[in-house]
Protein backbone atom coordinates (compact mmCIF):
# COMPACT_ATOMS: atom_id res chain seq x y z
CA UNK A 1 0.00 0.00 0.00
CA UNK A 2 1.04 3.62 0.41
CA UNK A 3 4.51 4.14 1.86
CA UNK A 4 5.04 7.90 1.54
CA UNK A 5 4.84 11.02 -0.61
CA UNK A 6 7.17 10.69 -3.59
CA UNK A 7 6.85 14.16 -5.11
CA UNK A 8 4.75 17.27 -5.57
CA UNK A 9 4.36 18.54 -9.14
CA UNK A 10 4.12 22.14 -10.33
CA UNK A 11 3.58 23.69 -13.74
CA UNK A 12 5.97 26.60 -14.24
CA UNK A 13 6.11 29.34 -16.86
CA UNK A 14 9.91 29.35 -17.22
CA UNK A 15 11.62 26.04 -16.45
CA UNK A 16 15.15 27.52 -16.46
CA UNK A 17 14.14 30.22 -13.99
CA UNK A 18 12.42 27.65 -11.76
CA UNK A 19 15.47 25.35 -11.79
CA UNK A 20 17.67 28.32 -10.90
CA UNK A 21 15.40 29.17 -7.97
CA UNK A 22 15.27 25.66 -6.50
CA UNK A 23 18.92 24.84 -7.19
CA UNK A 24 20.73 28.14 -6.65
CA UNK A 25 18.40 29.95 -4.26
CA UNK A 26 17.16 27.08 -2.11
CA UNK A 27 20.25 24.89 -2.44
CA UNK A 28 18.37 21.82 -3.69
CA UNK A 29 19.79 19.40 -6.26
CA UNK A 30 18.59 19.23 -9.88
CA UNK A 31 18.55 15.45 -10.37
CA UNK A 32 17.33 14.71 -13.90
CA UNK A 33 15.33 16.04 -16.83
CA UNK A 34 12.34 14.83 -18.81
CA UNK A 35 13.11 15.18 -22.51
CA UNK A 36 11.18 14.77 -25.73
CA UNK A 37 12.36 12.51 -28.54
CA UNK A 38 14.10 15.51 -30.13
CA UNK A 39 16.09 16.06 -26.92
CA UNK A 40 14.32 19.21 -25.73
CA UNK A 41 13.73 19.43 -22.00
CA UNK A 42 10.13 19.84 -20.81
CA UNK A 43 10.43 19.00 -17.13
CA UNK A 44 12.75 17.96 -14.34
CA UNK A 45 13.12 16.52 -10.86
CA UNK A 46 14.56 18.50 -7.95
CA UNK A 47 15.69 16.49 -4.91
CA UNK A 48 14.46 17.62 -1.51
CA UNK A 49 16.44 14.83 0.20
CA UNK A 50 16.07 11.08 0.38
CA UNK A 51 13.46 9.99 -2.16
CA UNK A 52 11.43 13.20 -1.84
CA UNK A 53 11.23 15.38 -4.92
CA UNK A 54 9.68 18.43 -6.54
CA UNK A 55 8.66 17.72 -10.12
CA UNK A 56 8.51 20.70 -12.51
CA UNK A 57 6.87 20.86 -15.94
CA UNK A 58 7.00 23.87 -18.21
CA UNK A 59 3.64 25.14 -19.43
CA UNK A 60 2.40 28.08 -21.43
CA UNK A 61 1.67 31.37 -19.66
CA UNK A 62 -2.07 31.24 -20.32
CA UNK A 63 -2.45 27.78 -18.81
CA UNK A 64 -0.53 28.80 -15.69
CA UNK A 65 -2.62 31.94 -15.19
CA UNK A 66 -5.89 30.21 -16.03
CA UNK A 67 -5.44 27.38 -13.56
CA UNK A 68 -3.43 26.86 -10.46
CA UNK A 69 0.18 25.80 -10.88
CA UNK A 70 -0.24 22.81 -8.55
CA UNK A 71 -0.85 19.69 -10.63
CA UNK A 72 -0.98 16.64 -8.37
CA UNK A 73 0.30 14.84 -5.31
CA UNK A 74 2.15 11.58 -5.81
CA UNK A 75 1.97 8.76 -3.29
CA UNK A 76 4.73 6.17 -3.24
CA UNK A 77 3.43 2.59 -3.18
CA UNK A 78 5.31 -0.65 -2.64
CA UNK A 79 3.58 -2.86 -5.23
CA UNK A 80 1.77 -0.98 -8.00
CA UNK A 81 -0.26 -3.91 -9.41
CA UNK A 82 -1.42 -5.05 -5.96
CA UNK A 83 -2.27 -1.50 -4.88
CA UNK A 84 -4.30 -0.84 -8.04
CA UNK A 85 -6.18 -4.12 -7.57
CA UNK A 86 -6.96 -3.31 -3.92
CA UNK A 87 -8.14 0.20 -4.79
CA UNK A 88 -10.39 -1.13 -7.55
CA UNK A 89 -11.82 -3.68 -5.11
CA UNK A 90 -12.62 -0.71 -2.84
CA UNK A 91 -14.53 1.01 -5.65
CA UNK A 92 -11.82 3.49 -6.65
CA UNK A 93 -11.46 4.17 -10.38
CA UNK A 94 -7.80 3.69 -11.24
CA UNK A 95 -5.83 3.84 -14.47
CA UNK A 96 -3.80 0.85 -15.56
CA UNK A 97 -0.19 1.01 -14.34
CA UNK A 98 2.38 2.10 -16.91
CA UNK A 99 6.12 2.53 -16.88
CA UNK A 100 6.98 6.22 -17.12
CA UNK A 101 9.93 7.88 -18.84
CA UNK A 102 11.64 8.00 -15.45
CA UNK A 103 11.56 4.16 -15.36
CA UNK A 104 9.10 4.16 -12.46
CA UNK A 105 5.60 2.68 -12.43
CA UNK A 106 2.64 5.04 -12.24
CA UNK A 107 -1.12 4.84 -12.07
CA UNK A 108 -3.69 7.56 -11.47
CA UNK A 109 -6.73 8.07 -9.28
CA UNK A 110 -8.72 11.17 -8.29
CA UNK A 111 -10.29 12.28 -5.05
CA UNK A 112 -14.02 13.12 -4.91
CA UNK A 113 -13.28 16.72 -5.99
CA UNK A 114 -11.32 15.57 -9.03
CA UNK A 115 -7.86 16.31 -7.62
CA UNK A 116 -5.41 14.02 -9.37
CA UNK A 117 -3.34 11.61 -7.30
CA UNK A 118 -0.46 9.67 -8.83
CA UNK A 119 0.48 6.27 -7.43
CA UNK A 120 4.21 5.76 -7.93
CA UNK A 121 6.39 2.65 -7.54
CA UNK A 122 10.15 2.85 -7.94
CA UNK A 123 12.08 0.20 -9.87
CA UNK A 124 15.77 -0.68 -9.75
CA UNK A 125 16.17 1.47 -12.88
CA UNK A 126 14.20 4.51 -11.62
CA UNK A 127 16.07 7.71 -12.41
CA UNK A 128 15.23 8.98 -8.91
CA UNK A 129 17.63 6.36 -7.51
CA UNK A 130 20.57 7.76 -9.49
CA UNK A 131 20.64 11.07 -7.53
Residue ranges, per PLM feature:
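A short beta-turn/loop motif at secondary-structure boundaries
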Residues: 36-38, 63-64, 99-101
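Mid-chain, well-packed structural core segment of small domains
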Residues: 66, 73-84
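Exposed loop/turn and edge beta-strand positions of beta-sandwich/beta-sheet ligand-binding modules
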Residues: 40-42, 69, 103
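Core segments of cupin and vicinal oxygen chelate
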Residues: 9-51
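Vicinal oxygen chelate
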Residues: 1, 84-131
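N-terminal beta-strand motif that seeds the catalytic metal site of vicinal oxygen chelate
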Residues: 1-17, 70-73, 125-131
